[in-house]
Every structure is written in C-alpha cells, then in structure tokens.
C-alpha cells in the first residue's frame, strides 16, 4: 500500500498464502462472467472483503508492484476502475490506497455496502435497511452481563443519550441497546460537541464487533480495548456516563462498587504511614486537563508546584478502589523515569491522587501529532532509553507493570519520558491470576501472559519491544491488519511485525530479541539498555 504495510512477508500464515493463477485462467470465459457479475459490487463507494492474496503471476502486464495490491481479508472501499477492467482502485480504513482484482472480492456479510453504516466511522445514524439481527438469547446474555457495568444504559433512547452526552468532553461515552437493530448494541461518544453513534454488531457466534476486524467476547472486553486506543473510532473512550439505575448486589452495595468510611480508613493507612496524606486546604484545584480511567484529571498547585490530580468520587462509580490501588503501588517508588506520586487527598468530597505534572502529555499523542518530520531519530532513541531505564528500576524491584505501552508513558517539560499508569502492576512473585475480562491489552501483552497468566519482567520486555515499534512507527497501532482475536495464534506460528519505515536495523534487531516466543530467551531490561546505549553512540 502507498503508506507501507506492516506484514513480514518472510513469515507466512494461513490467511496470506498467495494463490497462483495461470494467465490462461485469467482470460477464461468463466472469469469474464465473474467480472460482469461483480460490476455492481465494484461500484465506487461499496465496501468489500478481499477473498484471496494473489501472486505476481496473476497481475496484468504493467500493473504496480506487489505492495500496492490488497491482501486476503482486507476490508476496503472501492474508489473506481483502472485502465485494466479486471482491476479496481480501493482504500482501506487506514486511508491506504491500492488495488483489488474483480473476482477476488465479496460483499461484506453478503450485502452491498449501505450508506447508513460506515465501517469504523460514526455516521450519526445506526440504521441500515435489511441488516440482520442476532438471536435474542445471545443478546440477553450480553445485556445481563453488561448490567453490572456503570457505562451500560440498557434501553435508553437515542434522544436521551444525546441529551446526556452533548457538550461533554471528548471521549465521554455510554453503551446502550440498539433500537433499530434488535440484539445489537450502540456505542455512543461525545466528540467535538457532537454525539457519535457506533453500531456494535453481534456475529452468529455471539461475538461483538464495531468494524468487522476486531472481535470481542463481551461488551466489557470491547470497552476496555477502545479505552486503551481509539483504533479507528473518532476518539478513545475516556469517561463513562454512569447509569443511575445500575443493578445492585444481594448485600445492597452497588454492583460497580462503593466504599464505607471504615473500609476507606483501612485502605488508606499506607498513605498515612508514608506521610503522603495531603490536606485539601493545601491544594489549589484548577482546570480539567484530561480524562482518565477514574474520571477527570485536573491541573493543581501544591506548594507552588504544578501537579496533576486524578479525581474519583468516594461512592457510586466503582473507580475509587482502582485509584487507591494504583496510588498504593506507587508508594516507595522513586526514579527519574517513573511518574512520581506526590500524595493523596482524602478529606474532600472527592478523593485525589496527586502526581507530578507532565506538561507534554502522553507519548502516543506526541508521536502521532509531530510525526517523522518533527521528531529526529536522536529524540526517538532518548524516549526508548528513558523508558528502558525506568523499567530497569522496576525490574530491580521485581515489579511487573503489565500495561507498558506508549499511551502509558508521559513527557515532562524537557521531553523526558516517564512510565506511568500502575493500575495493573504487581510484584513478580505474586500468585494472582487475573488475566480474564479483557483487562490486558492483547497487542502489547506477551503470549505466555495471555495464555497462562504468566506475568514476569520478561513479559514486560515483550511489551517494551512493541513500545519500541510504536516509537519508530510514530504511533501506529501494532499488528494493524490482524484481527485482535488472531494475534496470539499468528505470533505462536512465528509471525512478527516488519520493521517500521526508516527504523535502524539495530533497533529492529532489539525488537525481535524482545519478541522471542520463550520468555527465558528474551533479554533482561538491563541487557536491552546496554544495547540501546551502544546503538545511540553509533546511529
């Protein structure tokens, strides 16, 4: 494709085995019949799926190079024809343009593209004539499970949804049952003053998808995925609109969590012992500067120093426990490349976790906004080394981060990179097994961690390799053309991503070393840092 592609042609897997066709078969009458039959399907604006990866012998004379031809299972939109009646111009969701052969495509779900549903692009309307619905039993299962989530609003109308979301910060969201597609759901999100609606479609097997590329077993997994990265949506999911009618457990507490005063005292004693409890009178709370998993992030001032305040209500939204757990894990950590915990505020109507203020935001946003024209290779190397030094410190403390990615790296005034977001961190010798329910980012997590919950510092090393790929690709989403549910299977069959465009070979070698299938074959963070130091002095 014109923007490059991330597949490694040296690692074959079932979905991309080239199919050879003789020149005689191309000219056969049956093929011409197929071309004629597909004429309506190939009208500009239609969405199709590529059914086969064709080999160079399948090309007409003078056609472009192989990388300009879409591959098996790509979802593309037809742009128009070419001088060769067998070939059509098309574009995928990443805005990459290329070619498809007329008898190597089929309709999506057996239907021509309908303007009412734009794949991975909010249309403002979730109505598509003739769209099939899934079984009520599967829908009921998903609805029942989702009732325990604060962002699920069941049968709320579209009109009331827009009243709740309109004017809210970008990324504020809720999930509701679809009124026009019984059995499906709708993801609704505020963006640039408007409300965008994404249809969540159920497959015949009960899986859920927004784009027919990423599939999820339940709504919780889907929401967790899009909280980590927009991955084609207009914005990543940030702050849920809490449903006031959420179900309650048998003991009377909200199914998405509440905390008694006594329990809160017990769980915050670690901060008191560490001298990290700060009076609300000593904090000046300023404007909202972001939105995180727990709620708003606000700018504040403490002792004439700018700080960031993560805010959680004391009761009713189920996020207080997570905020306190993250803050508790940060107690005692001290390194120039880790975001520093300043303290917690417990005597306010809200609970605040106070950290140092990082003026340049997160790394993924900076990579994508500035790009290769503004960020020199030397700066990319500094990001990599900063992060690696922070991870060396965690390695020495036998702490596993478990969510290492560019989105969880923050940058200070001087663009020093610091690892943040310790919500999933644990001690390396911990016996907890909690990899279920979509908590962990599949494309960043080592295969043994996903398969067997084996989280070690070596699984963090794997994630660091993915982070390196993010840095040198200037913020691309890893495995951009592989469905999320297939990533582990491809990795175990030997597939690895190609080097990003312009990536130094020495850096790509480090990436591949961190992606050794066996955890014991991966280098330690100390060894990775030594390699990066050598590369920095030579590149």
Curated annotation (Swiss-Prot):
GO terms for molecular function: ATP binding; metal ion binding; non-membrane spanning protein tyrosine kinase activity; protein tyrosine kinase activity. Residues 131-146 have a biased composition (Low complexity). It catalyses: L-tyrosyl-[protein] + ATP = O-phospho-L-tyrosyl-[protein] + ADP + H(+). Residues 283-535 form the Protein kinase domain. Keywords: ATP-binding, Kinase, Magnesium, Manganese, Metal-binding, Nucleotide-binding, SH2 domain, SH3 domain, Transferase, Tyrosine-protein kinase. ATP binds at residues 289-297, 310. The active site is at residue 403. Residues 151-241 form the SH2 domain. SUPFAM superfamilies: Protein kinase-like (PK-like) (SSF56112), SH2 domain (SSF55550). Disulfide bonds: none annotated. InterPro entries: Csk-like_SH2, Kinase-like_dom_sf, Non-receptor_tyrosine_kinases, Prot_kinase_dom, Protein_kinase_ATP_BS, Ser-Thr/Tyr_kinase_cat_dom, SH2, SH2_dom_sf. It comes from the Eukaryota. Belongs to the protein kinase superfamily. Tyr protein kinase family. CSK subfamily. Non-receptor tyrosine-protein kinase which plays a role in pharynx function by regulating pumping and the orientation of pharyngeal muscle fibers, independently of src-1 and src-2. May phosphorylate and thereby negatively regulate src-1 and src-2 activities. This is Tyrosine-protein kinase csk-1. It comes from Caenorhabditis elegans.
């Amino acid at each position: 494709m014109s923007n490059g592609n991330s597949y490694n042609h040296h690692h074959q897997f079932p979905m991309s085995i080239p199919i050879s066709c003789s020149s005689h078969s191309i000219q056969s009458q049956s093929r011409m019949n197929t071309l004629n039959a597909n004429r309506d399907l190939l009208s500009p604006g239609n969405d199709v799926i590529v059914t086969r990866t064709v080999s160079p012998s399948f090309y007409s004379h003078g056609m472009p190079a192989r990388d300009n031809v879409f591959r098996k299972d790509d979802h593309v939109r037809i742009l128009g024809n070419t001088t060769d009646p067998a070939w059509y111009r098309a574009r995928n969701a990443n805005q990459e343009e290329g070619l498809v052969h007329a008898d190597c495509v089929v309709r999506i779900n057996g239907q021509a593209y309908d303007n009412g549903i734009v794949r991975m692009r909010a249309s403002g309307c979730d109505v598509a004539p003739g769209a099939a619905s899934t079984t009520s039993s599967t829908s009921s299962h998903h609805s029942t499970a989702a009732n325990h989530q604060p962002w699920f609003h069941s049968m709320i109308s579209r009109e009331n949804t827009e009243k709740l979301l309109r004017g809210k910060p970008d990324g504020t969201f809720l999930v509701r049952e679809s009124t026009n597609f019984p059995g499906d759901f709708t993801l609704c999100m505020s963006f640039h003053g408007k409300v965008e609606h994404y249809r969540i479609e159920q497959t015949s097997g009960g899986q859920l998808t927004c784009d027919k590329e990423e599939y999820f077993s339940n709504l919780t997994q889907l929401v967790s995925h899009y909280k980590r990265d927009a991955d084609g949506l207009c914005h990543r999911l940030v702050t849920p609109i809490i449903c006031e009618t959420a179900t309650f457990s048998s003991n009377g507490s909200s199914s998405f969590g509440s905390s008694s005063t006594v329990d809160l005292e017990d769980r915050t004693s670690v901060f008191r012992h560490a001298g990290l409890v700060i009076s609300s009178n000593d904090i000046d709370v300023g404007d909202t500067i972001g939105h995180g998993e727990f709620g708003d992030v606000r700018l504040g001032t403490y002792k004439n120093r700018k700080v960031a305040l993560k805010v959680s209500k004391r009761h009713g939204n189920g996020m207080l426990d997570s905020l306190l757990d993250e803050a508790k894990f940060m107690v005692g950590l001290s390194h120039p490349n880790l975001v520093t915990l300043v303290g917690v505020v417990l005597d306010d109507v809200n609970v605040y976790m106070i950290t140092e203020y990082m003026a340049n935001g997160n790394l993924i946003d900076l990579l994508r906004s500035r790009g290769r024209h503004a960020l020199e290779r030397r700066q990319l190397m500094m990001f990599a080394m900063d992060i690696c030094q922070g991870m060396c410190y965690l390695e020495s403390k036998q702490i596993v981060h478990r969510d290492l990615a560019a989105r969880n790296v923050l940058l200070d005034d001087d663009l020093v990179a610091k690892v943040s977001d310790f919500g999933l961190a644990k001690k390396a010798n911990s016996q907890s097994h909690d990899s279920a329910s979509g908590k962990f980012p599949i494309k960043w997590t080592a295969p043994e961690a996903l398969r067997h919950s084996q989280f070690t510092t070596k699984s963090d090393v794997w994630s660091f390799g993915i982070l390196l790929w993010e840095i040198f690709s200037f913020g691309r989403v890893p495995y951009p053309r592989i469905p999320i549910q297939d990533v582990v299977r491809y990795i175990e069959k030997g597939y690895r991503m190609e080097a990003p465009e312009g990536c130094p070979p020495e850096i790509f070698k480090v990436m591949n070393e961190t992606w050794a299938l066996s955890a014991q074959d991966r280098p330690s963070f100390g060894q990775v840092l030594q390699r990066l130091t050598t590369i920095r002095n030579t590149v």
